[in-house]
Amino acid sequence: MFHGAITAWEAGASGAGTTIAIVDSGIDTANSEFAGRISSASADVAGSRGVRNTGDDHGTQVALVAAAARNDYGVMGIAWGATVQMLRADTPGTCASADGCTFSDTNIAEGIDAAVGAGARVVNLSLGGEAADTNLRAAVARATSAGLIVVVSAGNDGQSTDPAIDPNNPDPFAVSLLQAGGGNVIIVGSVSSAGLVSDFSNRAGSSASSFLMAQGETICCVYEGSQIRVVDGFRTAVNGTSFAAPQVSGAVALLAQAFPNLTGAQIVSLLLSTAREGGAIGTDPIYGRGILDIARAFSPQGSTGLAGTSVAVSLDSVAGTTSGAMGDAVSGASLGTVMLDGYGRAYALDLGRGLRFGQARQPLLEALRAGARPTGFEAGDVSLAFSVDRRFGAVPLRLAPGEREQARVLASTLVTRIGNARELALGWNTSSDALAARLQKRREAQFLVAGTANGMFERPELGFAARQRFGGMGVTVSGGRSLVWRPEALRDRREDRLARLGVALDGHGGDALDWRLGLGLMREERTVLGARFADALGGGGATTGTIEPGVTWRPMRGWHVGATGSLGFTRVAGTSVAPGGSRLVSSSWAFDVARDGALIEGDRLGLRLSQPLRVESGGLALNLPVAWDYATQTARFGRVPLSLAPKGRELDAEVAWSARLWDGAFSASLFWRRDPGHFAAAPDDAGGAVRWTAGF
């Protein structure tokens, strides 16, 4: 657990199908921890004794750390499914001596060559001593050139006081192999389970850039046959860099199995670059690159992107933020795909987990916050109007002779009549729809909550409208440009533009009926009905066509009955990830009944039932990589749909009364909202508001 191998195991890695070569003193072939996993290519490269050594268990202990079975007993190796190729290289007769086993450079070289011939991915050398001779160096060079990784222990002279020994560097044997094998050699020192350098371990020194630490202190356990040795009730543990090295060798096997595309040099790079800090930040002369961290080595590294594409993506990035019209559509959405990291390793990725709900509108709060007051003047056929915000104190403006106050101009409009039948309106920070409504003399009902809001946080920039009357009918052409922004724009600063163009025909059906029919076109640069999607989901951009009918009926004096609606058809811009076929249908509507002079002269009492803009059907038709073939280095793509139609449907009902009272404008409202924001799980929202405003 110390090195995070459980992450690899949970991902299905065990080292199965890979071979760990170990040049050492042999292995206990009868130990059930290795049952069925000792390679037939194992050999005694120093004689003809066989690989089983009854006089020394050093090689067995090394093999246990690297590859002991997952059998619910005793030791479990880092790569518990790997095949062990034991290459016995101890000089015959030396293991029985007082000084223990010795290994000649010639025999070690034979073992390394045998590992290359058997197709091993890593060779473990838990050995030490003097610098390697020319023959052994050449064998290491051949092995690393063939892609084999050489893992060698740093040495156990950390507490040595012998002037001929330098405990602050790996022993000469390890250093010489690093010099011979270069980038495919890792030297391994030892730390305790607390992550502290073991007293006995040689330090990284001048080999720090290729030096890893792994646990080599208090390593369980010594076996007798297939059973753990127990002495006086205690299990026997072992210490030494000899048992730190096979932890790294096991990690190599896990990576090689899980990611068959990796070269030896890439595996070494991964293990070194993902090591966790043990001492000073960065590479240091004690811990080298740090402590082996298998979990980090298995996590994506470097730049990441969708497999088989040039689309960048990351595990923690936001894949998309929906708009108000989409409500709870992406709740629980799953978009399984495949991502490659900087090493070309494939990972499963659920883009649905990166989808976020857009900030819900709070229509009552927005209405009550409004601090704008209109001001303007007319001169003949020209009128100029401003909306001024009292809440801002940045710019002093002279709004009228003798009037000074701290204010900000929120919007302005210029309307001019050209002849008797033609009008033109220009607006700054005013929507084209508002300009068109002004030219058409539409009297909009004043409701605080129940509207037909499109769910987009949209800020108009420039707008225009032109109207031509033909007898009892009129044609209005309007257009404008807006910014689609986020309420938290001060933090995000991201704004995308959209453009609108519309044409409407309006007329009268006698004295009691007004009607209009509009057609609209909206083009969004990077958004889809106000929603933003990352490049992994197509990146956004859409064109929406709308049909917008409306009718007002006056059945008797003072009464108004009206209905408006909008039906939209959206086509999302095609990309490599969303090549086409992404369509949405959306709608909004409102029904009004109003009475002028209901309670007092000049008042208006109204009732509205409405639905804000809602996606009725459709979504993104994505073409995402769903599998990766390491053999051919190609992705298999599949259709992955993302519905943007919410489960909830907001319905708003509001009763509103407005009148001139106490030298000001008074309004009162009672409202009820079902599924607010188009969220089916959201509780109903009901309330009321009273507002009185006056100018001073």
Provide a role label for each language-model segment.
Residues 1-4, 113, 120-124, 184-187, ...:
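C-terminal subdomain of the subtilisin-like protease fold in secreted/lumenal serine endopeptidases
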Residues 14-16, 89-182, 226-245:
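Substrate-binding/access-modulating region of protease and related hydrolase catalytic domains
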Residues 65-66, 87-90, 121-122, 216-287:
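Hydrolase catalytic cores
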Residues 412-416, 464-468, 503-507, 547-553, ...:
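Residues on the lipid-exposed face of transmembrane beta-strands in outer-membrane beta-barrel proteins
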Residues 419-421, 470-473, 508-512, 556-558, ...:
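Outer-membrane beta-barrel channels and translocator barrels
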Residues 437-456, 476, 491-495, 516-541, ...:
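Outer membrane beta-barrel transmembrane domains
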